Amino acid sequence: MPIGIPKVPYRLPGGQSQWIDIFNRLALDRIIFLGREVDDEIANAIIASMLYLDSEDPEKDIFLYINSPGGSVSAGLAIYDTMQHVRADVATMCVGLAASMGSFLLTAGAKGKRTSLPHSRIMIHQPLGGAQGQATDIGIQAKEILYTKDRLNQILSERTGQPLERIERDTDRDFFMSAEDAKQYGLIDQVVQHRPV
């Protein structure tokens, strides 16, 4: 039986309390949680949250916690572009799994603020795609996915400091890493053992 989304108490001005869902409570502390596959719906919610939090206070970090198997490249790139657009630093943390577009977003965090819990797994690979229809349409789709693959590899190379040739080789197939391996690779900056007080 599913437990649903937990509700937690929130103290209103004046001393009264009300129960709100935990994700809304986390958002009050500038924490956004990506805990599912990346699609247009979750991308729009994350983008809207980042834009709002940035307009509220561009000097305070936004925290993006990631436990995601990946998903839509276009939706993920929309989140990536927003992370680079907002004035506030976006600190990222892997909590469980950051695979495919999930790992791309993990690496997109502000340099020095990309972290992972010690037993998390991080996986990079090339984008997946498929096409059907007339031969000309399939050719158009093939060119587009190759362009996307090249662009993602270039960004990963820039964000990690790895040579483009290594990124191309490593993303040719699923490439899993431990948190410590991801740190050595340049996907993250720190493996977090304990939360700072």
From Swiss-Prot:
It is found in: Cytoplasm. InterPro entries: ClpP (IPR001907), ClpP/crotonase-like_dom_sf (IPR029045), ClpP/TepA (IPR023562), ClpP_His_AS (IPR033135), ClpP_Ser_AS (IPR018215). This is ATP-dependent Clp protease proteolytic subunit 1. It comes from the Bacteria. GO terms for molecular function: ATP-dependent peptidase activity; ATPase binding; serine-type endopeptidase activity. SUPFAM superfamilies: ClpP/crotonase. It catalyses: Hydrolysis of proteins to small peptides in the presence of ATP and magnesium. alpha-casein is the usual test substrate. In the absence of ATP, only oligopeptides shorter than five residues are hydrolyzed (such as succinyl-Leu-Tyr-|-NHMec, and Leu-Tyr-Leu-|-Tyr-Trp, in which cleavage of the -Tyr-|-Leu- and -Tyr-|-Trp bonds also occurs). It holds the Pfam family CLP_protease. Its EC number is 3.4.21.92. Fourteen ClpP subunits assemble into 2 heptameric rings which stack back to back to give a disk-like structure with a central cavity, resembling the structure of eukaryotic proteasomes. The gene is clpP1. It comes from Gloeobacter violaceus (strain ATCC 29082 / PCC 7421). The keyword tRNA processing does not apply. Its main location: cytoplasm.
